[in-house]
A protein has these predicted regions:
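A non-transmembrane, solvent-exposed segment enriched in polar/low-complexity residues
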Residues: 1-172
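Extended amphipathic alpha-helical segments with heptad-repeat/coiled-coil character used for oligomerization
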Residues: 175-241
Length: 241
């Protein structure tokens, strides 16, 4: 439901194979709720048995993220609901290495329990398809004009949307959620053209990149957003823009 419903969302995390000497880091981050920034929950330290429980106030269902070391695991956090997440830490560590990043045999390292376990599980197969700016994007957009940047972002959006729509492993609820997040990230990327283009050389570590002329005709630049269905839908409640 998209109705406002203030209540506690509880996340219980179990790290299988955990040992304190591993220095494992664990953060749980909300993607909206009261703030336009990704906000970490306060939580207790990981217990010696690898368990950790977090509770936070929420007013809407939202996608939150468990970050274990550098691996991000999205899930649906819902008011007045508890999600139990079991993570196989040795397998996750193996899957995070470049040697096994594409090895399907080491991909299964997380299991969910709760009302939305099916959506949470399916989200893992599309989590790399919901942001138009990927790991090479800032390198790609160095030196682009605003219009070139817009075309780059639009092509990325269309490619990722097609991948979500053709994914037979996800149900309609997960597909709608992934489409909504991708669409709003697309809109966010268009609005953030000045900052992204300006910061690209520094982030990509490139010197001598000419400064782009940031002047645009705003009406034509943002014209593609008129076709974005999520802007006319209640699903935009799941994002902070």
């Amino acid at each position: 439901s998209t109705d406002l419903n203030l209540g506690k969302t509880v996340v219980a995390v179990r790290l299988l194979g955990y040992k304190p000497e591993y220095k494992t880091t664990l953060d749980i981050i909300a993607d909206n709720w009261f703030s336009p920034y990704r906000m970490p929950y306060e939580h207790d330290s990981i217990s010696v048995d690898g368990t950790c429980q977090v509770s936070a106030n929420a007013i809407l269902p939202t996608v939150a993220t468990i970050r274990v070391n550098r691996t991000e695991i999205p899930f649906l956090a819902v008011p007045n609901d508890t999600t139990t997440v079991t993570i196989d830490l040795p397998t996750l560590t193996l899957a995070a290495t470049h040697l096994f990043a594409t090895d399907s045999d080491v991909k299964k390292y997380v299991w969910f329990e709760g009302k939305h376990a099916a959506v949470d599980t399916e989200l893992q197969s599309v989590k790399t398809k919901i942001d138009v700016l990927g790991v090479t994007s800032f390198d790609d957009i160095c030196g682009m004009t605003p219009l070139q940047y817009r075309d780059y972002v639009q092509q990325s959006y269309e490619r990722l949307l097609a991948a979500i729509n053709s994914n037979a492993a996800i149900g309609s609820a997960t597909r709608t959620l992934a489409q909504s997040i991708l669409s709003m990230n697309y809109a966010s990327a268009l609005f953030g053209f000045k900052n992204n283009i300006s910061m690209a050389p520094m982030i990509a570590g490139k010197r001598g990149v000419p400064r782009a002329d940031m002047s645009i005709d705003t009406v034509s630049y943002f014209k593609p957003l008129e076709k974005l269905a999520v802007l006319h839908s209640k699903n935009q409640r799941y994002y902070f823009y």
